[in-house]
Amino acid sequence: GFGPYMPGYETIPYNDLDALEESFQDKNVCAFMVEPIQGEAGVVVPDEGYLSGIRTLCDKYNVLFIADEVQTGIGRTGKMLATDYEDARPDILILGKALSGGVLPVSAVLADDEIMMCIRPGEHGSTFGGNPLACVVAKSALEVVKEENLVENAFLRGHQFRDRLKNLGEESELVKKVRGKGL
């Protein structure tokens, strides 16, 4: 574990909509941030309906939905964003890693004008954000993702890969569980 944690943040169990709704009873909660697929925790894919449930609860309680798609975004899951699997559009989207195709470090924080216009200069930043060269590389990487159908390829190859791993699991005790989406 890392620490100390920043004051004002609360950690709730992943994939638990009841715990999320309970935390929203606190009128001081302004946002909920989640990785759509828990990467560092061991590729933990949430139950179907979790992401759309987050969207519904955030709307109900007027809480911002922040999706940290640094590891899952830009087609890695077989959709452009992992939240696309459930049409759970976040209010704020965090991207990185694949954004530049691995060429240069770059990240981005995206939101509608309604949110972004509330942030004054100096109040917001992103690690590796704003580098003009990295921005050109990111734009080119996104064009390649689109032109070469890399999202669809990740979807198809991901299914193929997991199917083969499941077959290996039937033949060997080394593979206990196969999880994931896309590649």
Where are these regions (language model features)?
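Conserved N-terminal phosphate-binding loop of PLP-dependent enzymes in the Aspartate aminotransferase
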Residues: G1-L183
